[in-house]
Amino acid sequence: MRSNLSVGLDAGKALAVAWDVPVIGVHHMQAHALTPRLVSALEYRSSSGPDFPFLSALVSGGHSMLIESTGLADHKILATTGDIALGDCLDKAARAILPSHLAVPPYGRALEQFAFPAGASDYNYTAPAKRDAELARRVTKWGWGLGAPLAGSKNGSSSRKMVYSFSGLLSSIERFVKYEYDHQNSTISSQLRQPGELSDDERRDMAKEVMRVAFEHLASRVLLHLSSLPPAEAAKVKSVVVSGGVAANCFLRHVMRAFLDIRGYSHVELFFPPVELCTDNAAMIGWAGIEMWEAGWRSQLSVRPIKTWSMDPSASDGGILGVEGWLKV
């Protein structure tokens, strides 16, 4: 990836020299967070909202983080994944769950389409009204049930940590696919499922459940943060951006809205970019560059691709503006 970025950056710097125009380096995840502001500009709204401060859940195959954005380059990381990203979890779950003829990329989209062939009319989803219902394991008609990530820790202490964890969820669904369920002892057996034993109906329930549990886990950290704020501070947060490749999932959008509504945050507006702007795209990079330009920032021609670059000003590298190569004009 770094070599690809080097080629693109060098080409951009060459064009900047040839055309005698400035070059502006862009943080990839900053661009995702600012995408709804691009959408507002494209729709010719009077305000390029959402207005700061707002929260962003940035979810893709490589990232899962919740950030608080108080300014163009001021993004505090509130929660991030302790193991694998949400998109990675769903891709691997799809490859395990889907019938072989349907297991084609993009896997996350294939999983959603398989789970909900009729779209939103298939959702039949009710968000948990209370925390204990959120953490409870919902047993399916097949006997198995997926537990909420981090809910099984001693005394439930980890269930309130501001961290995401999707590896356990993936491991559980892979076991359910591979091994028969022992109904007598209410546990997964060591007996391998026979070829063709896993019906499409059970596969579809697996697809629905792995997405439901994953998306509720994502939403739960938004609620934990909002509930931790003093009322006056919580009132300032009027928007939550959900961006990145996984944000294209329509069921995620439904779960996030239902989750906030039933837990007393119906006033918080959710911003989801159009599907075509959820995955990595040039438009979001260009827009982030425009916003940095208008704020007076330029990059020196000596800048190079950065392998690890935090968004958070409190990080060891100083965040977006903490790295070398910026010029303020």
Please place each PLM-identified region on the residue numbering.
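Conserved phosphate-binding/catalytic loops in two-lobed NTP-binding clefts
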Residues: 25-26, 256-285, 299-303
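Glycine-rich beta-strand-to-loop/alpha-helix junction loops that act as flexible
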Residues: 1, 15, 60, 239-249
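Short beta-strand-loop/turn "lid" adjacent to the catalytic site in phosphate-handling enzymes
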Residues: 1-12
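Acidic, glycine/GT-rich loop-and beta-edge segments that sit at the periphery of enzyme/chaperone cores
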Residues: 292-329
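Glycine-rich phosphate-binding loop plus the immediately following alpha-helix
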Residues: 70-129, 166-181
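Conserved phosphate-binding catalytic cores of ATP/NTP-utilizing and phosphoryl-transfer enzymes
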Residues: 17, 21, 26-54
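Short beta-strand scaffold segments in enzyme catalytic cores
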Residues: 34, 56-58, 64-68
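A contiguous, well-structured pocket-lining segment that forms one wall/lid of small-molecule binding clefts
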Residues: 113-240, 249-261, 321-322, 327-329
